[in-house]
């Protein structure tokens, strides 16, 4: 009888031991690099792109670092040429383990460093391209059940992004409601620029953000409701051009160039058709 019990214990122990060995191996750098290359190869085949990763590092329990991520796609008009969809110098993801067991996500750090991107034809509505020095998010309150996100801190630094809207987008008849609610305690943007172009370059808007701070934001994506407690934009600039409109002397509403722009807003609220805010500071040169 004891012999049978021993064999039963051994049979139960073998898969447990093998699982523990596998877990330990996943924290060995050579195994990590081998595994990530296999995953990148599989993703490349499924997505029809070339995805490569230079190096990966996983520290117990879920502190992940990835270096040298490149995503290439064949050019849709020139044979033999590829477009770089993304080139990311480093990705850091530090996620707490225990909250995952209760369907919650707590992210101590999710950051992307030295990013260059070009969505090419992946997004029909627009082409987004540019570079980002740092994108950092800390979130200790993502609840997958209640569809709520609490962002403790978000930072964007050294970004230069352009968005070119398309005029050939078919109507989307498959839209589904989005019920997520997002709270943002603190948002910081430094040394960044954003350019928006409408189809056929009929309008261009360029925004320069040397320093922008926003606090206590709330965004209900289902109701399209957006609130901010405070927003401060310091020493920025704004260019607005109706490209095909002739220029006129004096204040030209079709061609506006604001510099040394300082803007302070309290209690911003927007939920169509209602817009409310307290304008604390507004100063600029034109």
Task: Label each PLM-derived region with a short phrase.
Residues 127, 168-172, 246-252:
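Flexible, surface-exposed loop regions and adjacent strand-edge segments
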Residues 72-73, 202-203, 246-247, 285:
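Short, surface-exposed beta-strand-loop junctions and turns on beta-sheet-rich folds
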Residues 1-48, 76:
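N-terminal type II signal-anchor transmembrane helix
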Residues 41, 172, 176-178:
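Sec-dependent signal peptide cleavage junction
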Residues 54-165, 177-200, 208-241, 259-282:
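Flexible beta-edge/linker motif
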């Amino acid at each position: 009888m004891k012999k049978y019990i021993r064999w039963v214990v051994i049979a139960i122990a073998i898969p447990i031991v093998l699982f523990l060995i596998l877990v330990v191996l996943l924290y060995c750098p050579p195994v990590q690099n081998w595994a990530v290359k296999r995953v990148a190869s599989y993703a490349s085949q499924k997505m029809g792109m070339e995805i490569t990763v230079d190096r990966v590092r996983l520290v117990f329990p879920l502190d992940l670092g990835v270096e040298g991520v490149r995503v290439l796609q064949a050019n849709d008009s020139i044979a033999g040429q590829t477009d770089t969809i993304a080139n990311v110098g480093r990705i850091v993801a530090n996620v707490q383990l225990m909250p995952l067991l209760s369907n919650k996500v707590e992210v101590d750090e999710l950051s992307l460093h030295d990013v260059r991107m070009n969505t090419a034809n992946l997004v029909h509505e627009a082409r987004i391209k540019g570079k980002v020095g740092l994108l950092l998010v800390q979130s200790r309150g993502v609840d997958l059940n209640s569809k709520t996100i609490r962002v403790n801190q978000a930072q964007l630094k050294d970004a230069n992004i352009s968005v070119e809207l398309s005029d050939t987008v078919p109507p989307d008849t498959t839209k589904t409601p989005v019920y997520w609610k997002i709270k943002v305690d603190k948002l910081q943007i430094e040394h960044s620029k954003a350019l928006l172009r409408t189809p056929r370059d009929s309008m261009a808007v360029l925004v320069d953000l040397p320093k922008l701070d926003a606090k206590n934001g709330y965004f209900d994506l289902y109701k399209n409701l957006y609130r901010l407690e405070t927003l401060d934009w310091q020493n920025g600039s704004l260019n607005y051009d109706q490209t095909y409109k002739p220029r006129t002397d004096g204040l030209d509403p079709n061609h506006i160039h604001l510099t040394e722009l300082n803007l302070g807003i309290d209690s911003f609220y927007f939920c169509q058709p209602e817009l409310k805010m307290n304008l604390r500071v507004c100063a600029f040169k034109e």
